[in-house]
């Protein structure tokens, strides 16, 4: 399925685990009753109207109940919306418009929003963690993955 390529293997595992925890009868589909029970198990009481509204947001084909692919598609839709915001943030930080964030660009940005300013070692650790191709800079895709993995 193409939408699965949008997510990392780790993300898919988390989504699948969450899905299975709601799918009480294990049939691969989530019914309104299962969704309501899942919320009730964490002491959140929702009206049937709210449950129906939530189901409709995910159930694009109106088939009720919803399956895992519909959940993935909704999550991808949400992440694509956030992706545009991440791209704007990246572009604002990429002051030399090189298509990557240098340690200096990251240091400037982080020192403006942290007090006390982050140390060189702390910034180097961030770059090392985010730098998938080990070129010492953070490319746009690496930046988006870094932001997404922190949530």
UniProtKB/Swiss-Prot annotation:
Q: Which UniProt keywords apply?
A: Calcium, Metal-binding, Repeat
Positions binding Ca(2+) 2 in this chain are: 59, 61, 63, 70
Q: Enumerate the GO terms in the molecular function aspect.
A: calcium ion binding
User: Which tissues does the record link to its expression?
Assistant: Found in cell lineages giving rise to the aboral ectoderm, a squamous epithelium covering the surface of the late stage embryo and larva.
Reply yes or no: does the keyword Metal-binding apply. yes
Give the residues the record marks as binding Ca(2+) 1: 23, 25, 27, 29, 34
Q: Please list the residues that bind Ca(2+) 3.
A: 94, 96, 98, 100, 105
Q: Which residues form the EF-hand domain?
A: 10-45, 46-78, 81-116, 118-151
Query: Which residues does Ca(2+) 4 bind?
Result: 131, 135, 137, 142
Q: What does this protein do?
A: Calcium-binding protein involved in larval development and metamorphosis. Likely to function as calcium buffers mediating the transport of calcium from the sea water to the blastocoel where calcium is required for skeleton formation.
Instruction: Return the protein name.
Output: Calcium-binding protein SPEC 2C
Look up and give the organism this protein is from: Strongylocentrotus purpuratus (Purple sea urchin)
């Amino acid at each position: 399925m193409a939408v699965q390529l949008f997510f990392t293997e780790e993300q898919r595992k988390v989504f699948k685990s969450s899905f299975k925890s709601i799918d009480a009868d294990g049939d691969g589909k989530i019914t309104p009753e299962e969704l309501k029970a899942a919320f009730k198990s964490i002491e959140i009481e929702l009206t049937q109207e709210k449950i129906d509204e939530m189901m409709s947001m995910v159930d694009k084909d109106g088939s009720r109940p919803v399956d895992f692919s519909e959940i993935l598609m909704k999550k991808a839709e949400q992440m694509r919306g956030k992706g545009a915001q991440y791209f704007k943030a990246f572009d604002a930080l990429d002051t030399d418009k090189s298509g990557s964030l240098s340690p200096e660009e990251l240091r400037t940005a982080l020192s403006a929003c942290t007090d006390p300013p982050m140390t060189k070692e702390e910034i180097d650790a961030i770059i090392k963690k985010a730098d998938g191709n080990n070129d010492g800079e953070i490319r746009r895709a690496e930046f988006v993955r870094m932001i997404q993995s922190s949530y």
